């Protein structure tokens, strides 16, 4: 099957975007894994599939797939890329809900919705205080996908990430953030992403880290999050909505053989 695609990235978090709005390719798991493979396929942190919306108010239906073929509920960096790809400040229909977007020059903002803080909604496998998990004292929330944030000055993300992602406390596995608070308006973050491993940036992980930091009184509601790939500006508004602002880049267009 021949597929047209666009390679994009947000702060080095890279994506293969397939526009199926006119003809849904109905990708199988094996095909997704192959396309995401950096040696035998195109290579990416996630594959993004666009199809026609099914909800009123949405401009495009977006699905996010990890390199292992599993589906993610949300991806902040990919959402900014989709906003650029589609144009016109689209509202995205995702498994996490409707995500409005906006553009200001080269920067794209996504309303990531409201975080879910109850243990059942993360979800966790048992009742826990999501602000202080019995797991490295992490804090947890859902941004449409499960996140846990560890706060400290030095973490070996590559060593801790795989085990924490699959800890029995997370029945759906989890994205694991390793955050260092630099000031009340600035943090350093690395994220071990569920199904993808350590990436250069994670938009939903940055949102979760700021939410969890604010809950602990560590930062203000607007915070710059510096990751290996660059900076995002995250704002957790008083009305509960989390806004993520950052760049989106088109790298090239191609067609599979």
UniProtKB/Swiss-Prot annotation:
Transmembrane segments: none annotated. It comes from the Bacteria. The gene is dapF. SUPFAM superfamilies: Diaminopimelate epimerase-like. Pfam families: DAP_epimerase. InterPro entries: DAP_epimerase_AS, DAP_epimerase_DapF. GO terms for molecular function: diaminopimelate epimerase activity. Its EC number is 5.1.1.7. Gene3D superfamilies: Diaminopimelate Epimerase, Chain A, domain 1. Pathway: Amino-acid biosynthesis; L-lysine biosynthesis via DAP pathway; DL-2,6-diaminopimelate from LL-2,6-diaminopimelate: step 1/1. Catalyzes the stereoinversion of LL-2,6-diaminopimelate (L,L-DAP) to meso-diaminopimelate (meso-DAP), a precursor of L-lysine and an essential component of the bacterial peptidoglycan. Belongs to the diaminopimelate epimerase family. Its main location: cytoplasm. PROSITE patterns: DAP_EPIMERASE. Keywords: Amino-acid biosynthesis, Cytoplasm, Isomerase, Lysine biosynthesis. The record marks 147, 193 as: Could be important to modulate the pK values of the two catalytic cysteine residues. It is found in: Cytoplasm. One of its GO terms (biological process) is lysine biosynthetic process via diaminopimelate. The active site is at 75 (proton donor), 202 (proton acceptor). The keyword Isomerase applies. GO terms for cellular component: cytosol. Homodimer. PANTHER family: DIAMINOPIMELATE EPIMERASE, DIAMINOPIMELATE EPIMERASE, CHLOROPLASTIC. Substrate binds at residues 13, 46, 66, 76-77, 145, 175, 193-194, 203-204. It comes from Gluconobacter oxydans (strain 621H) (Gluconobacter suboxydans). This is Diaminopimelate epimerase. It catalyses: (2S,6S)-2,6-diaminopimelate = meso-2,6-diaminopimelate. Coiled coil: none annotated.
């Amino acid at each position: 099957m021949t597929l047209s695609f666009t390679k994009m990235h947000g702060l080095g978090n890279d994506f293969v975007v397939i526009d199926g709005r006119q003809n849904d390719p109905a990708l199988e798991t094996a095909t997704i894994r192959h396309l995401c493979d950096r040696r035998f396929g195109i290579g990416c942190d996630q594959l993004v599939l666009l199809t026609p919306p099914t909800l009123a108010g949405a401009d495009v239906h977006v699905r996010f797939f990890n390199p292992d073929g599993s589906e993610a509920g949300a991806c902040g960096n990919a959402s900014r890329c989709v906003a650029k790809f589609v144009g016109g400040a689209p509202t995205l229909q995702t498994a996490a809900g409707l995500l409005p977007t906006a553009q200001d020059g080269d920067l794209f903002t996504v309303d990531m919705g409201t975080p879910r803080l109850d243990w059942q909604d993360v979800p966790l496998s048992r009742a826990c205080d999501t602000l202080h998990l019995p797991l490295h004292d992490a804090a947890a929330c859902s941004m449409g996908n499960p996140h846990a944030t560890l706060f400290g000055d030095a973490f070996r993300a590559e060593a801790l990430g795989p085990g924490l992602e699959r800890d029995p406390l997370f029945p759906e596995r989890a994205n694991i953030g390793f955050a260092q608070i630099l000031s009340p308006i600035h943090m350093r973050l690395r994220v071990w992403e569920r199904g993808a491993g350590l990436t250069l940036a994670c938009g939903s992980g940055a949102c979760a880290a700021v939410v969890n930091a604010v809950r602990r009184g560590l930062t203000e509601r607007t915070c710059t999050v510096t990751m290996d790939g660059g900076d995002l500006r995250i704002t957790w508004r008083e009305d509960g909505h989390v806004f993520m602002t950052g760049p989106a880049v088109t790298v090239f267009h191609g067609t599979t053989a």
